[in-house]
C-alpha cells in the first residue's frame, strides 16, 4: 500500500470513527438482575438482535455504534426497563418481540403492549405478546364480530378464549359458547369407534384444555352443567339464536361456506363472536372452498366486523415454529412446485 493509500484509509477510518456515537443508560439498581436475566440471557438476546455494541458495568449500560443503531438500542432498553419495573418477568422471547415492535412501523410502546393484562388466575397472567396480538385483542373489544386469521402458535384461539372468560367474569355476557367443526383431517365421525360423545370429544379437547388453564378446574363442570359454558360441535349451533353470549368458533378454515353462514347468523343481541382459523391448513374434502376464506371476502367491508391477521412474527411457541411456518409458506408459493420438481430431478440425476 502506497503512502497515499495509507492516508486515504486512515482518513476513511477516522470518518467512520467520527460517525460512531456513544450513549449510557443508568438502570435502577433493583432492576438490573431482571433486565439482564438469568446468566445474562436477556443481555445475550439483546446482543444478537441489536446492531449497536452493548457493555454493562455495574448498573450502567453503554451503547456504541451508528447513530440510528444506538437510538434504537436506547429505546429498546428503556422499554425493557419499564417492563421489568411493572413486575413482569423479562425473557429472551420478550426481548425479541420488543425489538421487532420498535423496528416496525407502529408507534406502540412495547411496555404498554406487553403489560396489558387480559386475565389473571393464581399468579398467572395472560397478556398479548406481540403488537398484532395487542391489535387483535383491541379489535375484540371494539367490534361485534372479529375474524382472527393466522398460522399455528399465534395465540388467536387462546386470546379469544381469555377474552371470553374475562367477559363472563365481568358480567358482560351470561354464557360462553365454544365450538369447532367436528370433522377434520379427512376423518368421518361415523367410521370412528365409540359413542357420539366419545367421537366428538377429541376434536373439542384443545378448547377444554384452554378452559382449564384459565379457570378453576372444580368450577368448570358446574358451569357446564348450568349451561353457562358450552363446548359443542358446530352442527349443534343450527336453529339457535345466541343472545348475551361470547361465542368462539375455532378451526374455522374447516367450515364450508354454508356452515359459516349458518354460524354467523346465530348471532343474537348482546353477543360477541370471534372466528379463528388458519387458511393454510384446510382439511375439507375434494378441494372444497373454505367458509372462512369466503366469509372474509364477503364481509370485510361491513362495519362492526373486523379481520385481524397474525403472521409468523406473532408465533409465541418455540422459536423454530415461526421458522417452520415461513419455510412451508415459501414451499407452497405458486410456481415453487416447478422448482421442487427441478430439484428432485437434479437430485435423481446426481444419484445415478
Swiss-Prot record:
The keyword Cytoplasm applies. SUPFAM superfamilies: Eukaryotic type KH-domain (KH-domain type I) (SSF54791), P-loop containing nucleoside triphosphate hydrolases (SSF52540). Keywords: ATP-binding, Cytoplasm, Nucleotide-binding. It comes from the Bacteria. Residues 1-21 are annotated as: Disordered. It holds the Pfam family PhoH. Its main location: cytoplasm. GO terms for cellular component: cytosol; plasma membrane. InterPro entries: KH_dom, KH_dom_type_1_sf, P-loop_NTPase, PhoH, PhoH2-like. It is found in: Cytoplasm. Belongs to the PhoH family. PANTHER family: PHOH-LIKE PROTEIN, PROTEIN PHOH. This is PhoH-like protein. It comes from Mycobacterium tuberculosis (strain ATCC 25618 / H37Rv).
Amino acid at each position: 500500500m502506497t503512502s497515499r493509500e495509507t492516508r486515504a484509509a486512515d482518513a476513511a477510518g477516522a470518518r467512520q470513527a467520527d460517525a460512531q456515537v456513544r450513549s449510557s443508560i443508568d438502570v435502577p439498581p433493583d432492576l438490573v438482575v431482571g433486565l439482564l436475566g438469568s446468566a445474562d440471557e436477556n443481555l445475550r438476546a439483546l446482543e444478537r438482535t441489536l446492531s449497536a455494541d452493548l457493555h454493562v458495568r455495574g448498573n450502567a449500560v453503554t451503547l456504541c455504534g451508528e447513530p440510528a443503531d444506538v437510538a434504537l438500542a436506547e429505546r429498546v432498553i428503556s422499554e425493557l426497563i419499564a417492563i421489568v419495573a411493572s413486575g413482569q418477568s423479562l425473557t429472551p422471547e420478550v426481548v425479541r418481540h420488543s425489538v421487532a415492535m420498535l423496528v416496525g412501523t407502529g408507534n406502540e410502546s412495547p411496555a404498554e403492549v406487553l403489560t396489558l393484562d387480559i386475565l389473571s388466575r393464581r399468579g398467572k397472567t395472560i397478556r398479548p405478546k406481540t403488537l398484532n396480538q395487542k391489535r387483535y385483542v383491541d379489535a375484540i373489544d371494539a367490534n361485534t364480530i372479529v375474524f382472527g386469521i393466522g398460522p399455528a402458535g399465534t395465540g388467536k384461539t387462546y386470546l379469544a378464549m381469555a377474552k371470553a372468560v374475562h367477559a363472563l367474569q365481568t358480567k358482560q355476557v351470561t354464557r360462553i359458547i365454544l365450538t369447532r367443526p367436528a370433522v377434520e383431517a379427512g376423518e368421518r365421525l361415523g367410521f370412528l369407534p365409540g359413542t357420539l360423545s366419545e367421537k366428538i370429544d377429541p376434536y373439542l379437547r384443545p378448547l377444554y384444555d384452554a378452559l382449564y388453564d384459565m379457570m378453576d378446574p372444580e368450577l368448570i363442570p358446574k358451569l357446564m352443567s348450568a349451561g353457562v359454558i358450552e363446548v359443542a360441535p358446530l352442527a349443534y349451533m343450527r336453529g339457535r339464536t345466541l343472545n348475551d353470549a361470547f361465542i368462539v368458533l375455532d378451526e374455522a378454515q374447516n367450515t364450508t361456506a354454508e356452515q359459516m353462514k349458518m354460524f354467523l347468523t346465530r348471532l343474537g343481541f348482546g353477543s360477541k363472536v370471534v372466528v379463528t382459523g388458519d387458511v393454510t391448513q384446510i382439511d375439507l374434502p375434494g378441494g372444497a372452498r373454505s367458509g372462512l376464506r369466503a366469509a372474509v371476502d364477503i364481509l370485510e367491508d361491513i362495519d362492526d366486523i373486523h379481520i385481524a391477521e397474525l403472521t409468523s412474527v406473532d408465533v409465541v411457541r418455540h422459536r423454530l415454529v415461526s421458522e417452520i411456518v415461513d419455510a412451508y409458506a415459501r414451499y407452497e408459493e405458486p410456481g415453487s412446485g416447478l422448482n421442487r420438481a427441478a430439484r428432485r430431478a437434479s437430485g435423481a440425476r446426481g444419484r445415478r
